[in-house]
Amino acid sequence: MSSQIFASDPRIAKALQTILDRGVTGVSVTAYYRGKSVIEGTAGYANVEKSRPVDRDTIFPVFSTTKGITALAVHIQAEKGLLRLDDPIAKHWPEFAANGKEAITVEQALSHRSGIPQMPADVTPELMGDWEWMIQRIANYTPIFPPGKSNAYHVLVYGWILGEIVRRTDPEHRPFGQFVKQEIFERLGVDKSIFYGVPDSELNRVATLYGKNQETIVDKYNVNPLPVFPGPRQHNLRSMLQAVDPGAGAVTNSASLARIFSMLAEGGELDGVRILSPERVKTFSRPREGVHDIDEIFTGPVPFGAYGFWVRQEGMSDPLVGDHDNIIYSPGAGGSIVWADLRDRLSVAIVNNHMDAGVSVDPEPIWAVLGRAVREVIADLQG
């Protein structure tokens, strides 16, 4: 079965064909340069069984790529003076103080240093979609690592912690999905192609996930329990697609992700719409405290920033995103990724529906060929 490739440049088309030849099912890429969309590409199938190709309307589960957008919501509240990043979370969410969590700060949650990476022991896809159920259980957590002292990646719980902080500090107390829609998506013109909970009317646009669940990953802290594990078995379920999961549940396309991160690459403003100040955006590439220390979940150092984004650190970061320190990015399970090059005013998003794409046995990561093609096109634009 041959697959259709659409690309704005023959170099992108060639790279997409190489990616399909390596076994990826469907993929979409978009790049913005100096605030304008300059690269578009789609290839492969959104649903193999129905022979439905990936096109501009196809939306994909992007897993932890979601986290970078959720972090933006916190910074919007900080920009409005509704919170400070060094505030204890309990200042805004009093119930959170239970069981030794009273001193955990907003920044510690943003940087995965709050000590509570675990999910509720009895979580199911249906319960994960019940915001109040999740929030009540998180409020009663006891830290499993010393808050502010250990790195421990919050695989899933991250989004509810930050989302509830945003909800509590919002004068209107909007549900988190409504907040990001109104404060980010609508203002940047991407609200028709990015969802925190896919409405019934848009389910037919969602790409089917393929590949393995990688459920052999050791999870002794219940950060990623099997009933809600990021993978095809669970995340093709309607209940998962429609849950508001701000840590790993956004469903979107590369165009929307690239546009949001173009706003960051442009210093917080795009097409006359200012979301954040340039001064705040400049802080996003700052590494978290203890960035070279072992992350208890990854069991090795992880280049996470202080304010909700991965950052470039020599020898630690994904080489795909660039080679200087003024870059922020947000990767997800299966290989979806978006980054903003704050120096060169470039944003790039790659999304796909093949869960093995992020785990390559090839000496070269699957996306490297596409990254090179993108940079060749951008180099021509730079002259």
Q: What do the PLM-derived regions correspond to, one by one?
A:
Residues E266, L270, S285-D295, G358-G383:
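Short, gly/Ser/Thr-rich active-site loops of penicillin-recognizing serine hydrolases
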Residues N47, N99-G322:
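Short, surface-exposed loop or secondary-structure junction motifs
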Residues V244-V251, D325-W339, N352-G358:
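Glycine-rich phosphate/pyrophosphate-binding beta-alpha loops
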Residues P10-Q17, G35, T58-D86, I161-V166, ...:
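Active-site SXXK
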Residues S8, I12, V62, T66, ...:
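Hydrophobic (often cysteine-bearing) scaffold residues that line and stabilize catalytic clefts
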Residues V38-G41, V338-W339, R345-H354:
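Short, well-ordered beta-strand elements
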Residues L85-N99:
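Short, glycine/proline-biased beta-turn/loop segments that scaffold the active-site neighborhood
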Residues S3-V62, L82-R84:
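Short, conserved catalytic-motif segment at the N-terminal edge
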